Regions:
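Helix-loop-beta junctions that constitute the ligand-sensing/allosteric loops
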Residues: 3-30, 69-72, 80-97, 105, ...
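Tandem CBS (Bateman) regulatory domains
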Residues: 39-73, 85-86, 110-161, 183-203
Length: 203
């Protein structure tokens, strides 16, 4: 578990979403990349192997302060893809919740949604609306994963066990945007909570 623990620490300190695992090649004596480990794979491993750990997981999201709830960047379906790109760069984010005029969450626009708009080196589609860009998603696109502030962390891990989740959108009973929980938020909480029990610190 120590290497996995160190991988989590390095991800948090560098804000990396994935890091390569290096091993020494016996034949060449050189370091070689064995695989690339992602935040999702780490959390999936924890979710599968700590199913019965109830001490830290049976706490509501609101009680542990998990996620971001202020200065949230949002967009409308009628906004252009280019405006979303500028917003992502400005706020250093990879996802923007799409809301209606009442603040109800309709969808999310992700960095990967930009790729079809610049395919072939043609950038005209960047002037199209976010709604148009989302229509280019494959039919099996997973859509939004959401939770409420009262959902417990173990229910989030249950979702991670079953689905490939990159983030959760926190909404109220009317599906209005409250916050966003990223995978790094969850990893940070798991590390801090575990280190507090051991009397250690991340810094």
């Amino acid at each position: 578990m120590r290497p996995l623990y160190e991988a989590c620490r390095r991800m948090l300190k560098t804000r990396a979403r994935r890091i390569p695992l290096i091993d020494m090649d016996d034949e060449t004596g050189r370091e070689t990349v064995v695989c690339v480990i992602t935040q999702y794979r780490i959390l999936k491993f924890i979710a599968v192997n700590n199913e019965h750990n109830t001490v830290l997981l049976k706490k509501p999201v609101r009680d542990i302060g998990l996620g971001t709830y202020s200065n949230l960047a949002t967009a409308r379906m009628t906004d252009t893809v280019l405006s979303a790109v500028h917003m992502m760069v400005k706020h250093n984010i990879s996802c923007i919740p799409i809301v209606d005029k009442h603040g109800h969450v309709l969808n999310v626009f992700e960095a990967v949604d930009i790729i079809p708009c610049i395919k072939g080196g043609v950038y005209d589609d960047l002037d199209k609306t976010i709604g148009d860009a989302l229509c280019k998603r494959p039919d099996d696109s997973p859509g939004i994963y959401s939770c409420s502030p009262d959902d417990r962390l173990d229910s989030i891990f249950e979702t991670l066990r079953k689905s490939r989740v990159h983030r959760l959108i926190v909404v109220d009973d009317e599906s209005k945007l409250i916050g966003i929980i990223s995978l790094s938020d969850i990893i940070r909480y798991v590390l801090f909570a575990g280190e507090e029990e051991d009397g250690n610190s991340l810094d």
